[in-house]
Regions:
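Formylglycine-dependent sulfatase
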Residues: 2, 9, 13-406, 414-437, ...
Length: 475
């Protein structure tokens, strides 16, 4: 079989791309929004209420994935998935750890897991983390012990934008030292990232910038509120101001990359940790059904884009399903960092797909488990069960039996309005069996609702959770 000319050119382009990075490793910038819904960015095409030219520029200069997902509908678990490149259910990080002083404060991203920071630091990268953590409160889980040279941010799940102390258990930290005062967290995190990039101009550097925007509390300064005087709803106006501030902050960081002359040697990702929590007031999800904490599309499909100017196509829209787990192996591939054979990534290297060397789908299927809720997408088909349940409150998924399961064709029905389960029982059974096969490789939640090991009640402070391997279900 002879390769097509286009495929040959794509292979040559990818080989050249990786060849150059062998001598000059690219910088890597990962920008994470908090609770940003699928429908709020202007580049997504559903609303122009909040101009986001800087975030939009990443899509303009790179690839925007319209079927971009995260591996759960909730905050800390998807961050754990990004950090490891693995489904968080593989190591029991199914729910949020904390808050501080609660029974689950002793838990976080298991110490047995290697992070993207660990691997890039070992490869000679300067590594910096500026913003939210939410991967554990205790010292063993601190970013400075998870592969990062610098940290400026907070360890918990939510924080005041204006008060450095936040609550007494979750202050803004520089390294391990508490700051006495801040201006506005969104601006502060961007300034710290800019400083880091400036100090490491010689490269290579990895900058992780997880904003707490646009997560509550709803707080903004007059600078941003004054941009939306035509909005009468106070909450919506404040939300718009918060998102506008985040876009400005992204612009500040991107400008520093350009100032350093590093735009063509910097791989950039932007995504959100889960879907928006409400329909209109605080981050909407456009045409998608459901919200944060639900496994309908509105909870798990998110804005997702990547840029590597001059190396991957610009202005490309790609509808193939991808997931935040892919960022870790993609970054390692770009950096020519070979992960050990036991890394067991669930994510894949996206570079050959965006350059055209590979034409198929990066994933045969994507999977979700969040308490009682389950979901799977394979091609255009999606099975979902328990999406309306409160996965945070209790219960856990067993087998994906078809009773009560919903089936949708997302190509024709992105809003999940027409349940086709009754018309396609064979497809429903096929996807349920596929989910069961995936879930057999997971373990029970290490803490939180439905956790069997009762780790939250028994482990010592600072010890990683030791959840139990899932047993085969008979029901």
């Amino acid at each position: 079989m002879h390769a097509s000319p286009l495929r040959t050119l794509a292979s040559i382009a990818l080989a050249a791309l990786l060849s150059c990075t062998a001598h000059a490793k690219p910088n890597i910038l990962v920008i994470l929004a908090d609770d940003l819904g699928y429908g709020e960015l202007s580049c997504q095409g559903f609303t122009q209420q909040i101009p986001t030219p800087n975030i939009d520029s990443i899509a303009k200069n790179g690839v925007r994935f319209t079927s971009g997902y995260v591996s759960g509908p909730y905050c800390s678990p998807t961050r754990a998935g990004f950090m490891t490149g693995r489904y968080q259910q593989r190591f029991g990080h199914e729910f949020n750890p904390g808050p501080a002083e609660a029974a689950v404060e002793n838990f976080g991203l298991p110490l047995t897991e290697k992070t993207i920071g660990d691997r890039l630091k070992a490869a000679g990268y300067a590594t910096g983390w500026f913003g939210k953590s939410h991967l554990g409160y205790k010292p063993p889980f601190h970013p400075l012990k998870r592969g990062f040279d610098e940290f400026f941010g907070f360890l918990g799940g939510a924080h005041s934008y204006l008060d450095a102390a936040g609550d007494k258990h979750n202050p803004i930290l520089r390294g391990t030292e508490q700051l006495p005062a801040i201006t506005y967290t969104t601006e502060e995190f961007a300034r710290e990232a800019v400083s880091f990039i400036g100090r490491h101009k010689a490269g290579p550097w990895f900058c992780y910038l997880p904003f707490n925007a646009v997560h509550g509390p709803l707080q903004a300064t007059d600078k941003y509120l004054n941009r939306f005087t035509g909005i009468t709803d106070t909450k919506r106006r404040t939300y718009c101001a918060m998102q506008s501030a985040m876009d400005d902050a992204v612009g500040t960081v991107l400008a520093k990359v350009r100032e350093n002359g590093q735009e063509e040697n910097t791989l950039i990702f932007f995504f959100s940790d889960n879907g928006g929590p409400t329909a209109q007031t605080t981050s909407g999800n456009g045409p998608l059904r459901g919200f944060k904490a639900q496994t309908w599309e509105g909870g798990i499909r998110i804005p997702f884009m990547m840029q590597w100017k001059g190396k991957i196509p610009a202005g490309k829209v790609d509808d193939r399903p991808v997931i935040q787990l892919d960022i870790h192996p993609t970054a390692l591939a770009a950096a020519r960092v070979e992960a050990p054979g036991d890394a067991k990534f669930d994510g894949v290297n996206l570079l050959p797909y965006v350059t055209g060397e590979k034409n198929g789908a990066p994933h045969d299927a994507l999977y979700w488990r969040f308490g009682q809720q389950i979901a799977l997408r394979s091609g255009d088909w999606k099975i979902v069960k328990g999406a309306g349940m409160d996965g945070i409150a209790g219960g856990r998924a067993g087998k994906a039996d078809t009773a009560g399961a919903e089936l949708y064709n997302l190509k024709d029905d992105i809003g999940e309005k027409s349940n086709l389960a009754g018309k396609n029982p064979d497809k429903l059974k096929e996807l349920a069996a596929l989910w069961d096969q995936w879930n057999a490789g997971n373990i029970d939640a290490a803490w939180g609702p439905g956790s069997r090991g009762k780790a939250a009640d028994s482990a010592k402070p600072g010890e990683p959770a030791q959840p139990k391997r899932r047993k085969k279900q008979n029901n």
